[in-house]
Regions:
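Thiamine diphosphate
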Residues: 1-156
Length: 156
C-alpha cells in the first residue's frame, strides 16, 4: 500500500511508471539518486538518467535544454538545494520562459533530521511560490506523492 511506503520510494516508483508510459521523460539527479529514489528510474532506464553531481544550478540549465528540445525533464535534489542553490537558474531558465521542467524536492521541511540544519528546508515552498509560471505541489504521504508525480507530469 502506497501509504505505508516512504514518500521518496513512492516518488521513485511513480517516475518509473511514468517512464514506462512516456519515453520522453528524462531524470536529472544532483548526486542524490539513492536518497531521492531516482535509482529506481536508473535501473529501468539508464539511458534516460543523467547524474550531474553536486551541481544543482547546472542540473536546472540542462533540464531547460532538454525541455527546449522536446523532452520532459525532471530534476531531483533535496528541496533545500533545489530551491535555494538553483533559484536564479530556475527563475531565468525555467519559470520566465515557461519551460516544461519538473523539479522534485526531496526531504522538504524538517524531515531530514539526520543531515542537520543545512539540509532542512523551511523556505522552499515560499521561494518556489514566489516565481511566475510555477506550480507547486506538496504531498503529505506516499499516496499523495504518487498522485502528485502524475499531476506534475501533466502540467505543461
Amino acid at each position: 500500500v502506497a501509504g505505508k511506503l516512504e514518500m521518496r520510494e513512492c516518488y521513485g516508483q511513480a517516475l518509473v511508471e511514468a517512464g514506462r508510459e512516456n519515453e520522453r521523460i528524462v531524470l536529472l539527479e544532483a548526486d542524490l539518486r539513492k536518497s531521492t529514489m531516482g535509482e529506481l528510474f536508473r535501473q529501468e532506464f539508464p539511458e534516460r538518467l543523467f547524474e550531474v553531481g553536486i551541481a544543482e544550478q547546472n542540473m536546472i540549465g540542462m533540464a531547460a535544454g532538454f525541455a527546449l528540445t522536446g523532452w520532459i525533464a525532471v530534476a531531483s535534489s533535496f528541496a533545500v538545494f533545489a530551491s535555494g542553490r538553483a533559484f536564479e537558474q530556475i527563475r531565468q531558465s525555467v519559470a520566465l520562459p515557461r519551460l516544461n521542467v519538473k523539479i522534485g524536492g526531496s526531504s522538504a521541511g524538517l524531515t531530514d533530521t539526520g543531515d542537520g540544519a543545512t539540509h532542512q528546508s523551511i523556505a522552499d515552498l515560499a521561494i518556489m511560490r514566489a516565481l511566475p509560471n510555477m506550480t507547486v505541489l506538496s504531498p503529505a504521504d506516499g499516496i499523495e506523492m504518487k498522485g502528485a508525480v502524475k499531476a506534475m507530469l501533466e502540467v505543461d
